[in-house]
Curated annotation (Swiss-Prot):
Domain of life: Bacteria
Swiss-Prot/TrEMBL GO biological process terms: aerobic respiration; anaerobic respiration; iron-sulfur cluster assembly; protein maturation
PANTHER family to which the protein is assigned, alphabetical: IRON-SULFUR CLUSTER ASSEMBLY 2 HOMOLOG, MITOCHONDRIAL (PTHR43011:SF1)
Bound cofactor: record note: Binds 1 iron-sulfur cluster per subunit. A study found 40-50% as [2Fe-2S] clusters, 15-25% as [4Fe-4S] clusters and the rest as paramagnetic iron.
Function: Probably involved in the insertion of Fe-S clusters into apoproteins in vivo including IspG and/or IspH. Essential for growth under aerobic conditions and for anaerobic respiration but not for fermentation. In vitro it binds Fe-S clusters and transfers them to apo-IspG, which is involved in quinone biosynthesis among many other cell components. Experiments indicate that it is probably also involved in the insertion of other Fe-S clusters than IspG/IspH.
InterPro entries documented for this protein: FeS_biogenesis, FeS_cluster_insertion, FeS_cluster_insertion_CS, FeS_cluster_insertion_RrpA, HesB-like_dom_sf
A Pfam match: Fe-S_biosyn
Identification of the protein by name: Iron-sulfur cluster insertion protein ErpA
One GO term describing the cellular component: cytosol
UniProt lineage: Bacteria, Pseudomonadati, Pseudomonadota, Gammaproteobacteria, Enterobacterales
Binding site for iron-sulfur cluster: 42, 106, 108
Length: 114
């Protein structure tokens, strides 16, 4: 998708830079970061991240800086208006989701409720 179109999910520069670095380490330019939601965690739903070289029918791909973020349609409905970012701090480094649809989140930020 083009940067000129309003996207339902933001893929930040920091996240795209980290994905680009990790893909270079794997030496597989076809890899994309997939964000998904599953049941579980202390708040009912949890975020997951994996690298995937497949884009399934119905998936949304957001391109930034030559790398892609892929989201399946079921997960996307819970992520609309949110962002995928990458942070480094005292707690370590990780991809994080900021989700305005979450009614509550757990302390670690990896699970949420709607």
């Amino acid at each position: 998708m083009s940067d000129d179109v309003a996207l339902p999910l933001e893929f930040t520069d920091a996240a795209a830079n980290k994905v680009k670095s990790l893909i270079a380490d794997e030496d597989n330019p076809n890899l994309k970061l997939r964000v998904y939601i599953t049941g579980g965690g202390c708040s009912g739903f949890q975020y997951g991240f994996t690298f995937d070289d497949q884009v399934n029918e119905g998936d949304m791909t957001i391109e930034k800086q030559g790398v892609g973020l892929v989201v399946d349609p079921m997960s996307l409905q819970y992520l609309v208006g949110g962002s995928v970012d990458y942070t480094e701090g005292l707690e370590g480094s990780r991809f994080i989701v900021t989700n305005p649809n979450a009614k509550s989140t757990c302390g670690c930020g990896s699970s949420f409720s709607i």
